[in-house]
From Swiss-Prot:
Organism: Lactiplantibacillus plantarum (strain ATCC BAA-793 / NCIMB 8826 / WCFS1)
Segments traversing the membrane: none
Protein name, as recorded: Protein SprT-like
Lineage: superkingdom: Bacteria
Family matches, as HAMAP family: SprT_like
Subcellular location as annotated: Cytoplasm
Membership in a protein family: Belongs to the SprT family.
Free-text remark on how the cofactor is bound: Binds 1 zinc ion.
GO terms under biological process: response to stress
Amino acid sequence: MTDLELQQLVATISMHDFHRPFQHRAYFNARLRTTGGRYQLASHDIDINPKMLTDFDEATLIGVIKHELCHYHLHLTKRGYRHRDADFKRLLAQVGGSRYAPAPKQATARPYRYIYECQRCGRRYYRKRRMDTRRYTCGRCQGPIKLV
């Protein structure tokens, strides 16, 4: 699904479920990591996490879109648009949006690039970042450390 198709889907859901037009931008934002979507108060745009489409089904995506549209329409009509507001909870239940987006699947942990070993006791240190072995010693025995 492209950003244009997402824009059309959001506009369709807005007219069908909220009976109001969506007049701003909706697009995928790959920088969203822990949330399904985001409504921006200043620009009124809606960002959607692309993982809601790739990792889950279309019903989940539509639930997230309805959630963000609740923020959008309530904010523009100057009513309670925050999660804790009764207006928000009422409208979300009325349109059948999702209260919570499912947690995106976590990427597999990157393997450690650097393995250091104490010359005296043999303890290993696994690091993602390089370190200056002349400045550091083993935390257990104070022996010198060497890159393996």
